């Protein structure tokens, strides 16, 4: 069981009744708290939880409509996402209890200060390298909309400026990361047809490709509902249309692709996790048509080239700079 869940269960008497577990891990916590419900935005966690606790977990970027008497937020990595979620919960919990749990290395001590606008926060427990904090919501805020927290910015591309709309919790919120910048300089001569932007994030790559190659069918896929919501806003801001999917890795992608384009993630919360990218490299061949291309950007220190050559085909480095490389391989 996740150590954060273990800390909650040390105080199980506090968590009886109508409780909302927000950003919960895919463990057995719901089994231990039979009256609780979950809310998550990670498609993999949602699938795992729904398989075991069908109908008890809501998915998406908005708090579920069903009433709850208390809520526990599992601290996310991004401070601005924490602010959004705490506001959404506290606005529904006037006079009731809001809890925050997280790992010490994830910044729970500092994050606990984000409870102070709602009342006097106190630490209830510290164990398993985690902390549990609680506040009685004395100052319930007005709920803010997610879109009001968006950070739009423009990037200059070969065919003109592109507007990117970034939401809290999305990778490189409010700015273009160096890996994507390098990949955007190298989206020439892509195969025509169906293109997948894998790990789409803000949607900057998929939107740029759709505008440059308007006759291509672009599919944008991410495991995170905040990312796919951001991608939809980016498309709308540029008057573009594409299919946007929230799903758990390459297994959620369609078959028969001509191109897979990606700046793949390698972090889950505060943890490094290469599994999604390695799974992409192992299975990309199954999703690509013969002659289809995998083109991705990765940090120099990540040794993806041997894996690409083993599972996709001969791999070349198309470009490199700023600590990143662009890899390209065509399915034979």
From Swiss-Prot:
Keywords: Cytoplasm, Methyltransferase, rRNA processing, S-adenosyl-L-methionine, Transferase. It is found in: Cytoplasm. Its main location: cytoplasm. It holds the Pfam family MTS. Its EC number is 2.1.1.172. It catalyses: guanosine(1207) in 16S rRNA + S-adenosyl-L-methionine = N(2)-methylguanosine(1207) in 16S rRNA + S-adenosyl-L-homocysteine + H(+). One of its GO terms (molecular function) is 16S rRNA (guanine(1207)-N(2))-methyltransferase activity. GO terms for cellular component: cytoplasm. InterPro entries: Mtase_sm_N (IPR013675), rRNA_ssu_MeTfrase_C (IPR023543), RsmC/RlmG (IPR046977), SAM-dependent_MTases_sf (IPR029063), Small_mtfrase_dom (IPR007848). Coiled coil: none annotated. Monomer. Belongs to the methyltransferase superfamily. RsmC family. Specifically methylates the guanine in position 1207 of 16S rRNA in the 30S particle. This is Ribosomal RNA small subunit methyltransferase C. It comes from Pseudomonas savastanoi pv. phaseolicola (strain 1448A / Race 6). The gene is rsmC.
């Amino acid at each position: 069981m996740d150590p954060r869940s273990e800390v909650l269960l040390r105080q199980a008497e506090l968590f009886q009744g109508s409780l909302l577990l927000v950003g919960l891990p895919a463990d057995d916590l719901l089994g231990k708290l039979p009256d609780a419900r979950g809310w998550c935005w990670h498609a993999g966690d949602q699938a795992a939880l729904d398989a075991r606790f069908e109908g008890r977990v809501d998915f998406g970027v908005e708090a579920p409509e069903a009433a709850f008497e208390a809520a526990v937020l599992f601290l996310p990595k991004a401070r601005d996402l924490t602010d959004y979620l705490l506001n959404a919960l506290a606005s529904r919990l006037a006079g009731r209890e809001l809890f925050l749990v997280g790992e010490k290395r994830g910044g729970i001590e500092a994050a606990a200060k984000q409870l102070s606008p709602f009342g006097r926060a106190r630490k209830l427990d510290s164990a398993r390298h985690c902390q549990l904090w609680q506040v009685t919501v004395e100052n319930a805020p007005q709920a803010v909309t997610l879109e009001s927290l968006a950070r739009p910015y423009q990037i200059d591309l070969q065919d003109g400026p592109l507007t990117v709309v970034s939401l809290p919790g999305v990778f490189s919120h409010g700015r273009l990361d160096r890996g994507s910048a390098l990949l955007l300089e190298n989206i020439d001569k892509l195969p025509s047809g169906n293109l997948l932007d894998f790990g789409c994030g803000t949607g900057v790559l998929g939107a740029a490709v759709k505008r440059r190659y308007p006759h291509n069918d672009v599919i944008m896929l991410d495991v995170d509902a905040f990312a796919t919501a951001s991608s939809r806003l980016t498309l709308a801001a540029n008057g573009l249309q594409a299919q946007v999917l929230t799903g758990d890795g390459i297994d959620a992608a369609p078959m028969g692709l001509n191109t897979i384009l990606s700046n793949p993630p390698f972090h889950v919360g505060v943890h490094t996790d290469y599994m999604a990218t390695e799974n992409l490299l192992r299975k990309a061949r199954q999703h690509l048509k013969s002659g289809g291309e995998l083109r991705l950007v990765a940090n120099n220190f990540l040794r993806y080239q041997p894996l690409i050559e083993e599972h996709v085909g001969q791999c070349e480095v198309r470009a490199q700079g700023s600590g990143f490389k662009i890899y390209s391989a065509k399915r034979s």
